[in-house]
Amino acid sequence: GLDEPLLRAVLDEAKTFGLRVTAHLGPVDALTAGEMGVSAIEHMSGVPEAAKADPKLDAAFKAGFFPGWTAFERAWAGLDSASLARVAERLVAEKVTLIPTLVLHDTFSRLDDPALAADSALRAVPDSEIVRWNVPGMVRRAGWTQEDFAALRAARANQDLFVRLYRAAG
């Protein structure tokens, strides 16, 4: 992910051309990104970091994509509704569009479930694409364990709650 100075440079360049910036955040939290001028946030990235300062999240992002993503997903379960509401209200006030991709969070939380591969929604996906996804390889590269999958499933309620709070805020 982009650190704050690099994100600022991207935003400055985009402003030159009248472009809006959507971001998949890493080390920059959602509120800081919104205040800087990011117009949309993918995957609700940066929300846990904005809701609760945790130096372990910053360290995880510095360690690489999968350590950062895993820490981000796991962090959702420990967030309280008041903090989530505060972040949602401020993002709405900054006019930041949220692109939650809840299906992504839900799918990641169930990659250890063999029934997921049999989901009827996958019938429309060509076999060559499913092979290209290489789910076992991704799980291996991410280093996800049964404990991680349980934590990702536990996080889902707060992710859904955040979307409801964001919508209610405006």
Q: How would you label these PLM feature ranges?
A:
Residues 8, 12, 31-35, 39, ...:
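Amphipathic, non-transmembrane alpha-helical secondary structure
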Residues 33-37, 42, 46-47, 60:
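Metal-associated gating/positioning segment near the N- to mid-region
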Residues 17-18, 35-41, 95, 169-170:
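Glycine-enriched alpha-helix->loop->beta-strand junction motifs that scaffold or abut catalytic
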Residues 51-170:
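Active-site neighborhoods of metal-dependent hydrolases
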Residues 21-23, 41-42, 98-100:
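Hydrophobic faces of well-ordered beta-strands that scaffold small-molecule active sites
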Residues 1-33, 48, 53-55:
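Histidine/acidic-residue-rich, glycine-tolerant segments that coordinate divalent metal ions
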